Amino acid sequence: MKLALFGGSYDPVHLGHLLLADAVHRHAGYDRVLFVPTFVSPFKEKEGSASAHDRVRMLHLAIGTTPYFSVEECEIRRGGISYTAETVQHVREKYGAQLEGKLALVLGEDAARSVPHWHAFDSWSTHVDFVVGARPVTSGDGGNVERATRTLQSFPFPWVSAENVALPISSTYIRTAIQRGRSWGYLVPSPVREYIIARGLYRS
C-alpha cells in the first residue's frame, strides 16, 4: 500500500485540502492519504482557533466514508511540538510490511521551500518522497507545474507535482469570514459547515 502523509492544522479543513488530497490519490497514485492534524497546546491556541478535539472531529466529518482518506491522530496524542521525524517513524512502524515503497509527504509550494530547515531533516528526508501541491495561479504566473519548478529549483530532493486544482481559499480566510459575518459556508464540506455553526466556532 502506497501511503501519503498530509499534515496541517486544519483549522478548519476546507475544500482546498480535500482537492489536493484527492489529486494525490488519483494523479500521484497513492492508495491512501493520511490527514495528520498538528497538536496545538491549549495554552498556545490563538484566539478564535478551534480545539484539537474540534479540528479532529471536523476532519472525520470532511472525509466521511471516502475509502482512500484516513485521519492519523499521532501528533494530537503525542502532544507538544509536532516533528515530522517522529511522525514519519510512527507511521512507518505502524504500517510496517503493508507499506509499498516510501511514504509520501504532501506539501504546499511555500512549505516545501522551508523543508531543509525542519527539525532533524537529514534523519527522515531520505525515507519519504515529496509530493508538492500547487498554490493558486495568478496573472502572469504561468502554469502550476512550471511555476513550482521555478520555485523549487534549490529543493535538494526529487519531487512530483500533485497536479491539483488550487483554490484561492485558506483556513485563515474562513475564520476571518466567520468573525466578520461574511459568506463562507460553501468553502467547506456541508457536515463541517453544520458542525462549525452548531459549535459556534471561530466567532470570537
Swiss-Prot record:
Pfam families: CTP_transf_like. GO terms for molecular function: ATP binding; nicotinate-nucleotide adenylyltransferase activity. It catalyses: nicotinate beta-D-ribonucleotide + ATP + H(+) = deamido-NAD(+) + diphosphate. CDD domains: NMNAT. Keywords: ATP-binding, NAD, Nucleotide-binding, Nucleotidyltransferase, Pyridine nucleotide biosynthesis, Transferase. Disulfide bonds: none annotated. Gene3D superfamilies: HUPs (3.40.50.620). GO terms for biological process: NAD biosynthetic process. Pathway: Cofactor biosynthesis; NAD(+) biosynthesis; deamido-NAD(+) from nicotinate D-ribonucleotide: step 1/1. Its EC number is 2.7.7.18. Catalyzes the reversible adenylation of nicotinate mononucleotide (NaMN) to nicotinic acid adenine dinucleotide (NaAD). Belongs to the NadD family. This is Probable nicotinate-nucleotide adenylyltransferase. It comes from Treponema pallidum (strain Nichols). The lineage of its organism: Bacteria, Pseudomonadati, Spirochaetota, Spirochaetia, Spirochaetales. The gene is nadD.
